[in-house]
Amino acid sequence: MTYEPFRIEGADRPARWLITCDHAANTVPPCVADGDLGVDAADMARHIAYDVGADGLASALAARLNAPAIFANFSRLVIDPNRGEDDPTLMMKLYDGTIISGNRHADAAERERRLDLCYRPYHHALAQLAARQGNTIIVS
């Protein structure tokens, strides 16, 4: 099975709204640190890894508005899709008191790899959805 860094719901829905959920998942793709950033399961279930409940809320809102929605399929601990590419907090080594050991030795090449694997495909798909209509309103 091929890893997909995002999922889209209701791509053909007609509303001009576009719902985004940057922190929908606490998933570490298998091709990043072998799927394990060295953070225990309890911490991966906390807000440090994703926004708990945001996925369901965004999905319900999109359905209610008859709008498309896009969801990141990777944890913000892998690379944060809600940051600019040059943001120093793009790949956190410490988050809310938890050491992210899988990011500890991540260098510029690993950062670029994660940008290409997760971040850029997500933002490219988001831009394509937004461009469908000239008057799209993005709700994040």
Language model features with spans:
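N-terminal catalytic or cofactor-binding beta/alpha core of small enzyme domains
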Residues: 1-138
